[in-house]
Amino acid sequence: MFIRNNRRSKIVATVGPASSSPDMLRSLFLAGVDTFRLNFSHGARADHAEVYRNIRALEQEHDAAIAVLQDLQGPKIRIGVLAHGRLDLARGSTIGFILGREGGEGMNDIPLPHREIFEVAVPGMDLLIDDGRIKVRIMEVMDGRLVCEVLNGGALSNRKGVNVPGAVLDISPLTAKDREDLEFGLELGVDWVALSFVQRARDMIEARSLVGDRAGLIAKIEKPSALDDIEDIVRLSDSVMVARGDLGVEIPPEDVPGKQKEIIRACRLAAKPVIVATQMLDSMVSSPTPTRAEASDVAGAIYDGADAVMLSAETATGAYPVEAVEIMNRIIEKTEKHKHYRPILEATEPDVAQSPPHAVATAAANVAVALGSPVVVAYTSSGTTAARISRARPALPILALTPSEQVARRLNMFWGVVGVRSQDVHTYEASLIHAQQAVQEAKLASPSDHIVIVAGFPFAQQGSTNNLRVVQIAATDNLEIA
């Protein structure tokens, strides 16, 4: 049984050309990766399937639960093909967006094949092009034409991306390609599905109707309108990703750190794991060491209470994928050992509405710390019990025992949780004995240690966390389930 017990926060790494071989996947896993991300914006399905199979082989090799995250591309809002392939936009000049895929009659006409933008356009609205590098303001709205003033100019080429900050577009977050990719991923057996271009809570309902309970559903927060609807989006999702790249284009950069903290707090309140992503160690795409600002960025997300931090290009296409994971692993370790880490986590603990399951989970964390227990054991069929304990952020690992292999994998996204597939137990006495065996096999506790065991009775009833027991571990030879 492979157990990672050097830190509580988790690492997500994106697989790409630099990291897709079996040997590289193994190196990344041993360096600290907890979840592998398959980015369906790039690569063929056959390539993703091969990577998936290699991850599952790695899982068997190390007797570990490894999660696989499928990240769907989502709709891409782009300009069309310019009449001359390039347009130099000068600040203060006037341009026109025309509805269509190819350039119009005027030299400064830019094709925009997205009627939904024309439907919401109003004078004074800003459009951002090429990741925000070019900024224009709508001056006049005509039938099939938007007359704009260039605020920030530059050279524009074909099919550059367009962002419409502050507007909610009448567009589904799932394209035809996404729906096909989603079904492919679910058939493959992915554990998490990340939904791009989430604008409002109802987008999650549409996705849930397709995913069901076959995978955990992650809402990527990259639109300002999603921030306005964040509580309902968190409620309807299983996890949230703070996608700071697109979000940082659509809101002022100075607003991103505060919004990151708000999203993390909302997720912790709901006991849902939150991933902080984008450009965390971006310089390591081409450099063997990160900038000091990047190291501080990773540490800041850990201090904020993030469940996981994510590497994108660093591991997908970078020259130093293993080094990026190793450094991120060390940053997390150092941060979690810092004298200010625990006080900050405790000061930001959310005020949760009391219920018996929440009270038991919180008590388990507190009792374990008070007794100096090395581990909390959580029996869970759906993952809810372990998630509730994780929300309390106890200073010790949470060993989640579940009969479901997929639940075990998903739980490894949660702060402090070690998900392990275990035998199904049906009696109270059997649960106590099996917990003692499991913590010793995982090398998380030794004979004579006191451990805290949390479960719900009757067994296999989702959300029924109602029992807490402190047990002193007996020697393995003296443990036997009748």
From Swiss-Prot:
Pfam families from the UniProt entry: PK (PF00224), PK_C (PF02887)
Keywords from the UniProt entry: ATP-binding, Glycolysis, Kinase, Magnesium, Metal-binding, Nucleotide-binding, Plasmid, Potassium, Pyruvate, Transferase
Residues that bind Mg(2+): 222, 246
Required cofactor(s): Mg(2+); K(+)
Residues given in the record as substrate binding sites: 37, 245-246, 278
Molecular function terms from GO: ATP binding; kinase activity; magnesium ion binding; potassium ion binding; pyruvate kinase activity
Pathway, per record: Carbohydrate degradation; glycolysis; pyruvate from D-glyceraldehyde 3-phosphate: step 5/5
Site (Transition state stabilizer): 220
PROSITE patterns: PYRUVATE_KINASE
InterPro entries: Pyr_Knase (IPR001697), Pyrv/PenolPyrv_kinase-like_dom (IPR015813), Pyrv_kinase-like_dom_sf (IPR040442), Pyrv_Knase-like_insert_dom_sf (IPR011037), Pyrv_Knase_AS (IPR018209), Pyrv_Knase_brl (IPR015793), Pyrv_Knase_C (IPR015795), Pyrv_Knase_C_sf (IPR036918)
Induction: By tartrate.
Reactions catalysed according to its record: pyruvate + ATP = phosphoenolpyruvate + ADP + H(+)
SUPFAM superfamilies: Phosphoenolpyruvate/pyruvate domain, PK beta-barrel domain-like, PK C-terminal domain-like
EC code: 2.7.1.40
Binding annotation for K(+): 39, 41, 71
Residues given in the record as ATP binding sites: 39-42, 78, 160
Keyword Metal-binding included in the entry's annotation: yes
Keyword Chloroplast: no
Protein family membership: Belongs to the pyruvate kinase family.
Subunit composition and interactions: Homotetramer.
Name under which the protein is recorded: Pyruvate kinase
